[in-house]
C-alpha cells in the first residue's frame, strides 16, 4: 500500500513539472537575458525607469534572479520603446 501511495505521489509531481517549467514560455514571455543582459520593452523610461526595467525583468525572467542584487539602467528608444540594461544580473 505504501508503494502505491509513493508511486501515485511521484506521478503527480512529475506531471506538474512540465507545467511549472513552461509557465509563461508558451507565449514567448520568458526570455534569456544572458549573455547581453539587455532587453527592449515597450513604454517610456520615466523617472523610475530603472525600477520599471527591474519589474519587467522579474516578470519575464526566472524568479530566481531575485536572489541576486540587481540594478538596471533605462535608455529611451524610438517608437515608445526602452532599452533595459541590467549589468549586475548574475547569469546561471
Curated annotation (Swiss-Prot):
Membrane-spanning parts: none
GO biological process: defense response to fungus; killing of cells of another organism; signal transduction
Intrachain disulfide bonds: 34-91, 45-74, 53-84, 72-86
Record's subcellular location: Secreted
The keyword Cytoplasm is assigned to this record: no
Database matches in InterPro entries: SCRL
Claim: DNA-binding is one of the keywords in the record: no
Keywords: Antimicrobial, Disulfide bond, Fungicide, Plant defense, Secreted, Signal
Signal peptide range: 1-24
GO terms under cellular component: extracellular region
Family membership: Belongs to the DEFL family.
Protein name, per record: Defensin-like protein 249
The species this protein was found in: Arabidopsis thaliana
